[in-house]
């Protein structure tokens, strides 16, 4: 069967080839109904726009791709990423000017560790790697470009994944969805055991610290625009497990969700702020990710609230930064490097052939107790 081209899509959709190209590369310039029609027809015909269509024609590229949400792309203007610094080439730097110093608590270390595992496994197998990243404000063109150049693609999407033509890609190359629990596509789904992690946290808080009043903080709606908005389906899964396990233990779950105000930076953690102002904080805050926990602890400390003496805070992920902050963060450690390795192995096992049905793999997690809960 001949490879489907942009001309085939344009003819069936009744539009110009330029409109088809714009639908993938500049979707904001195409009417919603036209864009939806083009994407639907592309999916039906198995068309994948590519920056390297020759790779698809060859059938094999010897390269695997990984596409990740990078929260650094969400940082505001003037954060040191976009602007030239006048002292960048100076022999002497003013020690008081440190706004270009990297903030270890603000880096997507979860993504970094997964990427490292993916890279190591590809290196071990003699495969090349093509990486891509986007913020939530970006469209899907970079994903489809990468997909056309690789034999398989791992994705670490967050709240914007519904914008991606994933159903179309899943019919063309093998996909591994990292941190996604909703098995809608014929692809591999790779997650840590979120439910087990939450149970371990709750058990520790109840049995060791005698806590019976706790609440969850996390972007359960997906797609938060805050600086820590790296949350994915994992956070939704963790919240669901949290609420369910509170009920199983006979604890009040009516106030299980304290804060999901992650839609914009102006609204970020507004419910936590309100709880501080009204003096109605629970005994413990269980955060959906370590990065959310960092921001919560900063907010509490800046408000004169001691952690863990006044309020216990826990995270989830186990990134390195949790050991560098004060107090050290009690968290659930998930095997991030192993997630990357497994993603690469799963893609390698397919030899470029897409999955015919969903396949799921869940990796175990463990509790790490430190100072933010009063241990260690």
Regions found by a protein language model. Name each.
Residues 1-63:
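N-terminal helix-turn-helix DNA-binding module of bacterial transcription factors
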Residues 2-4, 43-106:
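N-terminal helix-turn-helix/winged-helix DNA-binding helices
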Residues 44, 94-100, 113-128, 152, ...:
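Bacterial carbohydrate/catabolite-sensing allosteric modules
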Residues 47, 134-139, 156-162, 291:
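Short beta->alpha connector loops
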